Amino acid sequence: MPSPRRTIEGRPLGSSGGSSVPGSPAHGGGSGGGRFEFQSLLNCRAGADPACARLRASDSPVHRRGSFPLAASGPAQAAPAPPPEDARMNLNPSFLGIALRSLLAIDLWLSKKLGVCAGESSAWGSVRPLMKLLEISGHGIPWLLGTLYCLLRSDSWAGREVLMNLLFALLLDLLLVAVIKGLVRRRRPAHNQKDMFFTLSVDRYSFPSGHATRAALVSRFILNHLVLAIPLRVLVVLWAFVLGLSRVMLGRHNVTDVAFGFFLGYMQYSIVDYCWLSPHNVPVLFVLWNQQ
């Protein structure tokens, strides 16, 4: 005789006989046990019966694939996949980025320390009027007006040639500085006071220093094309250096603004010297100027 089958609830089911429980759906029918077992499987709820939950979990395709192994079933867990190469590179900052950030921090700190004439209440506030006078000596407007006046008053071809190239150098300096300032758009230091002499819209930016570029350009131009005594030559170099330093002391620029300005002005003279205007390469310009 075959052993009686048991339902998930633990009660015996007769294969052909009646159920021991009166009023059950399997009572009095040969196929009632099969219907009772089928309905019991349909009516079981997840979590209500542990056996049903285990049955449903074991029959699921995800469990059969082994995508979610039990913590206690295996001796060791699978090692996590290593991050991709790009992610590992992004987590480690480059040496160049660290160097640039360090240089910027040193630049801001040193510029603030050297801004001793940024205001009347600063450490060297009493020297501020003298520094502002030095600021005017390196402004572009006085240099342009002075060069034009000397060019009009000159009566020699050699003098006009030198002055015309100086005018060309000053215009080139204004153009290059304005373009770079518009591209970089670096704000002036926070301790700067807005009392500069004759500023334009682009002058609200600080990189590079126009006074520093002009000082380097003009001093190199004068030393190469004017015959001066040694004390005057030393005075020209000293003027250019003090003018650049005054930009930081007044709080107008950072140290890197002035340093790059000196470099740019030095290179600008090389451009002017390469494109030197003379009666031989641009005779029309000198003839027209001579007729004025």
UniProtKB/Swiss-Prot annotation:
Active site positions, chain numbering: 211 (proton donors), 253 (nucleophile)
Start-end of Low complexity biased regions: 10-25, 69-79
CDD domains xrefs: PAP2_containing_2_like
GO CC term, one of those recorded: nuclear membrane
Residue numbers of Phosphoserine PTMs: 24, 67
Region entry Phosphatase sequence motif II, spans: 208-211
Keywords, in A-Z order: Endoplasmic reticulum, Hydrolase, Immunity, Innate immunity, Lipid metabolism, Membrane, Nucleus, Phosphoprotein, Transmembrane, Transmembrane helix
Gene: Plpp6
Region (Phosphatase sequence motif III): 246-257
Top-level taxonomic group: Eukaryota
Compartmental location: Endoplasmic reticulum membrane; Nucleus envelope; Nucleus inner membrane
The keyword Electron transport is annotated on this UniProt entry: no
InterPro entries: P_Acid_Pase_2/haloperoxi_sf (IPR036938), P_Acid_Pase_2/haloperoxidase (IPR000326)
PTM text: Phosphorylation by PKC activates the phosphatase activity towards presqualene diphosphate.
GO MF assignments: isoprenoid diphosphate phosphatase activity; lysophosphatidic acid phosphatase activity; phosphatidate phosphatase activity; sphingosine-1-phosphate phosphatase activity
Protein name listed in UniProt: Polyisoprenoid diphosphate/phosphate phosphohydrolase PLPP6
Catalytic activity: presqualene diphosphate + H2O = presqualene phosphate + phosphate + H(+); presqualene phosphate + H2O = presqualene alcohol + phosphate; (2E,6E)-farnesyl diphosphate + H2O = (2E,6E)-farnesyl phosphate + phosphate + H(+); (2E,6E)-farnesyl phosphate + H2O = (2E,6E)-farnesol + phosphate
Transmembrane segments: 132-152, 162-182, 226-246, 258-278
Lumenal topological domain: 153-161, 247-257
EC number per UniProt: 3.1.3.-, 3.6.1.-, 3.6.1.68
Chain intervals for the UniProt region annotation (Phosphatase sequence motif I): 181-189
Purpose: Magnesium-independent polyisoprenoid diphosphatase that catalyzes the sequential dephosphorylation of presqualene, farnesyl, geranyl and geranylgeranyl diphosphates. Functions in the innate immune response through the dephosphorylation of presqualene diphosphate which acts as a potent inhibitor of the signaling pathways contributing to polymorphonuclear neutrophils activation. May regulate the biosynthesis of cholesterol and related sterols by dephosphorylating presqualene and farnesyl diphosphate, two key intermediates in this biosynthetic pathway.
Family stated for the protein in its record: Belongs to the PA-phosphatase related phosphoesterase family.
Residues in compartment: Cytoplasmic: 1-131, 183-225, 279-292
Pfam families: PAP2
BP-aspect Gene Ontology terms: farnesyl diphosphate catabolic process; geranyl diphosphate metabolic process; geranylgeranyl diphosphate catabolic process; innate immune response; isoprenoid metabolic process; phospholipid dephosphorylation; positive regulation of neutrophil activation; protein prenylation
Marked site: Stabilizes the active site histidine for nucleophilic attack: 257
